[in-house]
Amino acid sequence: GLKSLRTDTYSGRMYQKLLAHHISVYSAHTNLDSADGGVNDVLARLLGLTDLKGLVPVAEDKLYKIAVYVPESHGDAVRQALADAGAGYIGNYSDCSFTAKGEGRFKAHEGTHPFIGEIGQVEKAAEERIETIVPESKLRQTVQAMLVAHPYEEPAYDLYPLKNAGHPFMMGRVGTWPTPEPAMDVLKKIKGLLHRDALSYAGDTDVIVRRVALLGGGGAGFIKLAKDAGAQLYLT
């Protein structure tokens, strides 16, 4: 973060001009730092790290359960729509859902266009209750996809917030270096991979590096997390 404002530096002059012209700046670089496939994943792949784990917890994509009641004739269509929208993922499994059969009852009033039954009469319908899990980031699109696939004019559905752990968004990565070797050799390889003329480093260059932590940007405040994660070298 910004710790001083000096006009004799490049960044200081930039801030001075922004303030003088009443310009607000919103920088979303942290989004790329913590996104799956973002800056840190790109760096980790470039360095050849494997067995990757996140370093700094940032947020969690909370989980919801959606339960929808649908006539048996359209159960498969609604299940497919939910899956296509991103619902139903549990670990490395997709298209996860549960179905229970039952009887739905309703009475349509004037001005409605019921898919089943007549206006003014209580109708019984053979229905399925379809349940599946969906992350908050895909909740809106999942509900919309379900509504499009559902034949009813007014589908009945429930949304339940869950206490299950959702997908974590993490800044930084910790991974296994391809071959255990002295830190100085690792630094030389990193310098070449990143096409740098020089690297600044501190610490014992003879230590054998097996795990490497990295965090794009200024990550000096997370050195302890890197050490606790088992890294012998921290790149930031």
Each model region followed by its residue ranges:
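Hydrophobic structural segments
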Residues: 1-236
